[in-house]
C-alpha cells in the first residue's frame, strides 16, 4: 500500500461532462421511489447536456427476475425516460449487466489485494462476538478489524483448519468528510465504520465492491441515489481512494442523497403499500406527464408557488443543488389533482385517443372501434376532458354511452337520490322529447326546461336528476343535454321509459 491513498483524493474535474447512472436491481415491481431516482438522474443529465448510463445490478440470482427487468423497461418507456448508454443501447463500457462483468471485478479485486488495500479475514462471527465480550463491549457491535495484520503463518494455520476467508477493505483511520449535493457537508468519524466485506469466502464480489467499481470504470461524475444509501458512502469513498491509487478510478465522484418518500402517517413508503407501485397509478389512469410532474415534486419544485410544469420545463430548470433534504410525502390527492391539470392540458385529439385503452379494458369496445363507437367518442371526449382527473374515470363517466339500453343499471347512490317526484319528471320528459323533430342539445334543453322547470315548477338544480339517472344509471354524468343528443332519440326515450316502468313496478 502506498501513502498516497490518504492524501491523494482527486475530485471530479470542473470541466468534466456530467455522467450519471441509474442502476436498479431487477427485484419486484418498480416503485415510485426508484422511478423518482431515475427521473432526477435523467433530468440532471438532460439539463446539463450530460450522459445517463443505465446499468442493471443483477448479481442476486435468488431474487433477480427477468420479469422485473422487463417491468423496469416498461416503466421507463411509459414515462419517456431515455438513456444514452447501457442496457439495450450499448456503449463504450459494455456489458452493462453486473452478472456479465465477473472477470472485471476479479481483476480489480486482485489488484486491491496485491496492493494491500484489501485483506483476508478468517474470523467467524462467534469469534468476533467473543472478542467484544472479553473487552466488555456490545457483542453485536460488528467486525473489530482483528484480521488486518495476520502473519502468513497465521493465515496458513487458518487455511489448514479448512477456513475460507472473506475479503475486507481497510477503512482509513481518519474522519471521512464529503459535501453532499443535497445535504451539504457530512462527516463520518474515524472508527465509526469498520472494515467491510467486498468479497465472500467463495470469492464472489459483493455490491459494496462492484457498484463503485462500475461507477469508476464508467466515469460517473455524480452518484444521485436514495437517502437509505447515505450510510454506505464512507465505505465507498474509502474504496474509491483505493481505486484511484491502483489506477482503476480517475477521481472520486460527487454524491447526492435524495430524500425519503413517505406514505400515510409519515411512515416511509413501503414497497408493500399500493401507492408505491408505479403501475398501480398507471392502471388508475395517471398519464406520464402528470405522474412525472408529481414525482419531480418529491424533493424539488419549479418555484415556491408553481406546482404544475411540463417535462420541458423540468429539464430546463432542474438543478440537483435545489433538491430538498427533508422527506417528501406521497400525497395521492395532490398527485391526482396535478394529473387532472395535465389531462386538461392535452390536445383534444390526444386526450380522445388516450381514452380508448380504458374503454377497451372495461369491455366497452373491441380491439377496433366501430364507426358508431368512433362517433360517440369523438363527440363525448370534449364533454369530459375538463372534468376528468384520472383516465381511469373513463368507464364511470362515458360507459353508459357505449352500453346497450338494456345494460343500464342504476347505481345505488343514484337510486337513493330519486325524489317522490321522479315518476312525474320522467313522464314529463317523455312527453317533451317524443315529438322533437330536432334532437339536438339545444332543442332538448329547451324542451325539458319548459316541461319540468316551468311545467312542474321544480328548481333547475333538481329538475333533471331523474333523467340523468335514467339514461346513465349514475348520479353524475357528462353534460346531460349533449349526452342525450349523442345517445339519440330512440335510446334516450327507451332508457327514460325503462326507469319509469321500474319505478311504477316498485
Swiss-Prot record:
Region of interest (Disordered), ranges: 124-147
Family under the similarity heading: Belongs to the class-I aminoacyl-tRNA synthetase family. Glutamate--tRNA ligase type 1 subfamily.
Protein name, per record: Glutamate--tRNA ligase
Compositional bias of kind Basic and acidic residues: 128-147
One Pfam family in the UniProt entry: Anticodon_2
Gene Ontology MF term list: ATP binding; glutamate-tRNA ligase activity; tRNA binding; zinc ion binding
Record bears the keyword DNA repair: no
UniProt motif 'KMSKS' region: location: 268-272
Secreted in keyword set: no
Amino acid at each position: 500500500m502506498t501513502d498516497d491513498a490518504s492524501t491523494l483524493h482527486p475530485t471530479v474535474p470542473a470541466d468534466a461532462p456530467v455522467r450519471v447512472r441509474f442502476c436498479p436491481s431487477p427485484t419486484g415491481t418498480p416503485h415510485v421511489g426508484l422511478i423518482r431516482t431515475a427521473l432526477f438522474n435523467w433530468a440532471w443529465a438532460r439539463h446539463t447536456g450530460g450522459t445517463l448510463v443505465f446499468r442493471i445490478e443483477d448479481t442476486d440470482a435468488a431474487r433477480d427476475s427477468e420479469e422485473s427487468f422487463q417491468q423496469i423497461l416498461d416503466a421507463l418507456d411509459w414515462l419517456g425516460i431515455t438513456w444514452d448508454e447501457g442496457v439495450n443501447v450499448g456503449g463504450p463500457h459494455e456489458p452493462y449487466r453486473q452478472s456479465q462483468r465477473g472477470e472485471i471485478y476479479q481483476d480489480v479485486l486482485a489488484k486491491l489485494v496485491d496492493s494491500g488495500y484489501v485483506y483476508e479475514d478468517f474470523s467467524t462471527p462467534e469469534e468476533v462476538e467473543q472478542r467484544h465480550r472479553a473487552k466488555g463491549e456490545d457483542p453485536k457491535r460488528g467486525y473489530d478489524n482483528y484480521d488486518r495484520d495476520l502473519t502468513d503463518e497465521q493465515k496458513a494455520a487458518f487455511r489448514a483448519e479448512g477456513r475460507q476467508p472473506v475479503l475486507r477493505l481497510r477503512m482509513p483511520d481518519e474522519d471521512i468528510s464529503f459535501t453532499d449535493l443535497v445535504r451539504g457537508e457530512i462527516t463520518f468519524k474515524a472508527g465509526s465504520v469498520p472494515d467491510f466485506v467486498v468479497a465472500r469466502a467463495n470469492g464472489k464480489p459483493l455490491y459494496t465492491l462492484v457498484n463503485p467499481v462500475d461507477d469508476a470504470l464508467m466515469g460517473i461524475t455524480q452518484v444521485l441515489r436514495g437517502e437509505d444509501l447515505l450510510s454506505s458512502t464512507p465505505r465507498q469513498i474509502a474504496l474509491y481512494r483505493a481505486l484511484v491509487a491502483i489506477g482503476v478510478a480517475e477521481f472520486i465522484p460527487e454524491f447526492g442523497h435524495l430524500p425519503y418518500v413517505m406514505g400515510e402517517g409519515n411512515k416511509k413508503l413501503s414497497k408493500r403499500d399500493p401507492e408505491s407501485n408505479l403501475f398501480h397509478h398507471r392502471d388508475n389512469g395517471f398519464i406520464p406527464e402528470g405522474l412525472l410532474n408529481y414525482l419531480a415534486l418529491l424533493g424539488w419544485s419549479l418555484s415556491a408557488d408553481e406546482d404544475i410544469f411540463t417535462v420541458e420545463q423540468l429539464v430546463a430548470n432542474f438543478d440537483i443543488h435545489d433538491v430538498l433534504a427533508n422527506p417528501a410525502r406521497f400525497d395521492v390527492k395532490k398527485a391526482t389533482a396535478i394529473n387532472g391539470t395535465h389531462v386538461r392540458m392535452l390536445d383534444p385529439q390526444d386526450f380522445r385517443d388516450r381514452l380508448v385503452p380504458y374503454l377497451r379494458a372495461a369491455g366497452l369496445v373491441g380491439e377496433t372501434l366501430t364507426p358508431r363507437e368512433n362517433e360517440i367518442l369523438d363527440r363525448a371526449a370534449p364533454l369530459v376532458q375538463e372534468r376528468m382527473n384520472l383516465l381511469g374515470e373513463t368507464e364511470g363517466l362515458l360507459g353508459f354511452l357505449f352500453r346497450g339500453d338494456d345494460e343500464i343499471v342504476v347505481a345505488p347512490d343514484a337510486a337513493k337520490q330519486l325524489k317522490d317526484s321522479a315518476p312525474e319528471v320522467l313522464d314529463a320528459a317523455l312527453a317533451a322529447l317524443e315529438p322533437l323533430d330536432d334532437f339536438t342539445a339545444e332543442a332538448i334543453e329547451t324542451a325539458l326546461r319548459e316541461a319540468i322547470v316551468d311545467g312542474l315548477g321544480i328548481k333547475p338544480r333538481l329538475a333533471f336528476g331523474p333523467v340523468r339517472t335514467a339514461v346513465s344509471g349514475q348520479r353524475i354524468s357528462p353534460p346531460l343535454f349533449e349526452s342525450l343528443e349523442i345517445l339519440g332519440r330512440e335510446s334516450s326515450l327507451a332508457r327514460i321509459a325503462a326507469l319509469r316502468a321500474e319505478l311504477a313496478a316498485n
